């Protein structure tokens, strides 16, 4: 019985860790983007290739992190897809000529640098990453 209780406690702790870690992802944008917040549905539309602007009219270009923990957390928290399903969706859009695959960058610092220097760029990074020169968007 003690083993079952301990297993249940460890499983619950793991789930709490996943929820807490999702909050560790920041959505960032170039300062040229007018918005200060973005809805989860707008974010999903932009990062799945279904929109090129936010509801306020700001044109945006999504920038992706290459596979890793922050990328997986972003997809899980805001897109609701696994990396495999997410990339399959983009490949379908690219193959049909409806969109071009977003730029994939290696590491949070590269995303911050690219977003800071490219009008309309929007990306995501770890909350712990220094992010001078970019705007943090609140996700509602």
Residue ranges and their predicted role:
Residues 8-11, 21:
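Cleavable N-terminal signal peptides
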Residues 15-23:
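Sec/Tat signal peptide C-region and signal peptidase I cleavage site
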Residues 1-8:
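Bacterial N-terminal signal peptides that target proteins for export
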Residues 24-140:
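Exported/periplasmic ABC-transporter solute-binding proteins
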Residues 10-13, 117:
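Residue-level detector of alpha-helix boundary/anchor positions
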């Amino acid at each position: 019985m003690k083993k079952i209780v301990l297993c249940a406690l460890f499983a619950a702790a793991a789930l709490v860790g996943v929820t807490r870690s999702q909050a560790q992802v920041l959505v960032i944008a170039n300062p040229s983007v007018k918005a200060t917040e973005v809805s989860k549905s707008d974010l999903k539309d932009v990062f799945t290739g279904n929109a090129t602007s936010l509801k306020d009219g700001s044109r945006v270009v999504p920038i992706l992190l290459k596979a890793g923990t922050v990328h997986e957390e972003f997809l899980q928290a805001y897109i609701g897809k696994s990396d495999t399903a997410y990339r399959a969706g983009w490949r379908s859009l690219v193959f049909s000529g409806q969109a071009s695959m977003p730029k994939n960058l290696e590491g949070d610092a590269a995303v911050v640098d690219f977003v800071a220097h490219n009008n309309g760029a929007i990306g995501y990074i770890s909350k712990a990453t220094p992010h001078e020169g970019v705007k943090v968007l609140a996700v509602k």
